[in-house]
């Protein structure tokens, strides 16, 4: 079996996690108490869904997941929510006092008291696997727990499970919408360890997803639930090939192989199509070509950065539902002929496709329409550098005045760590600039863009 363990850290990680597990349960027909009427083999079978759920002797399906937060309120919602019977109580780990939006508290003072407990639980889950494939880590880098405890856990996972791949789904601060003043500090400090300790990181950004909800689903005032349900569709499409059988299955390690040209260049953009409300879906014919095109639309990207400002290095298209390889090849051929979508000149093929016959499931009473086919795209584009340069700029404005730094130093950090992390990000921006540059120097003369 190729099991995956999901780790949800901090409020954002947990709330995205709730949406994901709700969707997985619906997709597999698992009830909120963990029973699965369709599953005839009692005890651990080697059905495809066992990559994400372990099975007890009593026929109950338990998610291979850990939820961690430094304060109890968000986890208490899981403990009392609709899916409270799904999770083993030991999988929900909460502390007493929160990280107060402070990376240093999450990483040093308060985080380190809880991290061994987390690793202990993760070890139990790992021992329960026959062939652990890797970890999916969900967190946000703007707050204190997601950034601080998140990077601490990633560092420790690298030590304990060196060869296992780690996929991060990371919520980055948005350009306009901010939830805390010290977001730029937390993000820069946290990205420093995301660079070292994740193999692929998918960037998400609330503002971009808000816009998608407003524009495509006509939700005037999207809530986090709306956002998370959209994100969960992306994550579900990525992991569908691990949980169902399909024509072209894609493994977690395959993402790495196909998307990451150099170890540091591993920050991905994601998009999903069709995002369409039920009223509209009746009147649209959502062919493979159409949904493929809309996945490449700059407005479909789930992070605020414009792929037209950069070049694609590779992209992974995961189709699900009523899709045949012939249609996919035709759609990809059309994309390649489009001048608007530019690839770097050293990567001629650039596409990895996966097809899964399980049609997309929607949450009843949710916003998305039930459709026959959908596509999720994960792409590695040099335009991701925009996200980093934006955060770096905000970081510099505060750090030149050393504003708020005493809160971090007071929790046992050294000022050198700030400049070290900042230099690391500056180097990352440079790396992106270099991979996007023409390999035959300056024959086209379009270096002015950067």
From Swiss-Prot:
Annotated site (Involved in polymerization): 450
Annotated localization: Cytoplasm, Cytoskeleton
Main subcellular localisation: cytoplasm
Keywords: Acetylation, Cytoplasm, Cytoskeleton, GTP-binding, Hydrolase, Magnesium, Metal-binding, Microtubule, Nucleotide-binding
Location of the region described as Disordered in the Swiss-Prot/TrEMBL record: 431-450
Disulfide bonds: none
Annotated active site: 254
UniProt EC number: 3.6.5.-
Catalysis: reaction(s): GTP + H2O = GDP + phosphate + H(+)
Gene3D superfamilies per record: Helix hairpin bin, Tubulin/FtsZ, C-terminal domain, Tubulin/FtsZ, GTPase domain
Family named by the database record: Belongs to the tubulin family.
Protein name: Tubulin alpha-4 chain
Native species: Gossypium hirsutum (Upland cotton)
């Amino acid at each position: 079996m190729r099991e995956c363990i999901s780790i949800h850290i901090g409020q954002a990680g947990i709330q995205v996690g709730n949406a994901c597990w709700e969707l997985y349960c619906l997709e597999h027909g698992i009830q909120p108490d963990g029973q699965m009427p369709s599953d005839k083999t009692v005890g651990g079978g080697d059905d495809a869904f066992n990559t994400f759920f372990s099975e007890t002797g009593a026929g109950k399906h338990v998610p291979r997941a850990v939820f961690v937060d430094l304060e109890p309120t968000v986890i208490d919602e899981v403990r009392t929510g609709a899916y409270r019977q799904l999770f083993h109580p030991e999988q929900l780990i909460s502390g007493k006092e929160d990280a107060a939006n402070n990376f240093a508290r999450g990483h040093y003072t308060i985080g380190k008291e809880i991290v061994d407990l987390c690793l202990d639980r993760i070890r139990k889950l790992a021992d329960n696997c026959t062939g652990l494939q890797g970890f999916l880590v969900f967190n946000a880098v703007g707050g204190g727990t997601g950034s601080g405890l998140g990077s601490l856990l990633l560092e420790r996972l690298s030590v304990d499970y060196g060869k296992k791949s780690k996929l991060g789904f990371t919520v980055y601060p948005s350009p306009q919408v901010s939830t805390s003043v010290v977001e730029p500090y937390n993000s820069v400090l946290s990205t420093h360890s995301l660079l070292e300790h994740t193999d692929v990181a998918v960037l998400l950004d609330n503002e971009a997803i808000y816009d998608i909800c407003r524009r495509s689903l006509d939700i005037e005032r999207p809530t986090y639930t709306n956002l998370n349900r959209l994100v969960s569709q992306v994550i579900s499409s990525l992991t569908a090939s691990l949980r169902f059988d399909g024509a072209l299955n894609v493994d977690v390690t395959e993402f790495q192989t196909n998307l990451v040209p150099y170890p540091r260049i591993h920050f991905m953009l994601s998009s999903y199509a069709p995002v369409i409300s039920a009223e509209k879906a009746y009147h649209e014919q959502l062919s493979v070509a159409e949904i493929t095109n809309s996945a490449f639309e700059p407005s479909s990207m789930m992070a605020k950065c414009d792929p037209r400002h950069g070049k694609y290095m590779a992209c992974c298209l995961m189709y699900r539902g009523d899709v045949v390889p012939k249609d996919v090849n035709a759609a990809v051929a059309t994309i390649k002929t489009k001048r608007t979508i530019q690839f770097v000149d050293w990567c001629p093929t650039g596409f990895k496709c996966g097809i899964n016959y399980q049609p997309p499931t929607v949450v009843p009473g949710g916003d998305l329409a039930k459709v026959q086919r959908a596509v999720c795209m994960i792409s590695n584009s040099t335009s991701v550098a925009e996200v980093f340069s934006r955060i770096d700029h905000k970081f510099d404005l505060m750090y030149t005045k050393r504003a708020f730094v005493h809160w971090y130093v007071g929790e046992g950090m050294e000022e050198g760590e700030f400049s070290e992390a900042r230099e690391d990000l500056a180097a990352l921006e440079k790396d992106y600039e270099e991979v996007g540059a023409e390999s035959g120097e300056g024959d086209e003369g379009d270096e002015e863009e950067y």
